[in-house]
Amino acid sequence: MRIGLFAVGRLKSGPEKDLAARYFDRFAKAGPAVGLELARVAEVAESRASNAETRKREEAAMLLKSLADGSILILLDERGKALDSEAFASLLGSYRDQGKRDLTIAIGGADGLDPSLYDRADATLCLGKMTWPHQLVRILIAEQLYRAVTILSGHPYHRV
């Protein structure tokens, strides 16, 4: 199953980008052994519209346009469901085992996500109750993708 990340906003060069790249690279190398591969990390510029609702609508349109047909869509939102690492790995494994070909994880912009995306989403998850800047969210989700691969493969990286 191909897993991609869609993010509103671009990471500038620096330690955050380097750390996210390190975990995406680990995921890309380890994932194929358990049937998961990194499709792409798509970054789009934040909308320049003058109001938040229009910005969210425009960003949602870019996301929907980038989705492969039949892609699973997981939104990251502070009001989403909190999963521990094992449950996240299980969720990915379950989509893989159902024969799903593509999965996209979406990180919204500063204004959040357009309401229309929640109807289209297969799941809405949070990375805790706190609000995180998108630079850190990328690192967190990249690490959790790598951790999910290690859990699914029985690798000792994930220790409880």
UniProtKB/Swiss-Prot annotation:
Name assigned to this protein: Ribosomal RNA large subunit methyltransferase H
Lineage: Bacteria, Pseudomonadati, Pseudomonadota, Alphaproteobacteria, Hyphomicrobiales
Single Gene Ontology MF annotation: rRNA (pseudouridine-N3-)-methyltransferase activity
Cellular component, GO, one term: cytoplasm
Summary of the function given for this chain in its UniProt record: Specifically methylates the pseudouridine at position 1915 (m3Psi1915) in 23S rRNA.
Top EC group: transferase
Subcellular localization: Cytoplasm
Species this protein is from: Rhizobium leguminosarum bv. trifolii (strain WSM2304)
Pfam families per UniProt: SPOUT_MTase
Catalytic activity: pseudouridine(1915) in 23S rRNA + S-adenosyl-L-methionine = N(3)-methylpseudouridine(1915) in 23S rRNA + S-adenosyl-L-homocysteine + H(+)
Alphabetized PANTHER family for the sequence: METHYLTRANSFERASE, RIBOSOMAL RNA LARGE SUBUNIT METHYLTRANSFERASE H
Family: Belongs to the RNA methyltransferase RlmH family.
Binding site for S-adenosyl-L-methionine: 76, 108, 127-132
Assembly notes: Homodimer.
E.C. numbers: 2.1.1.177
Gene: rlmH
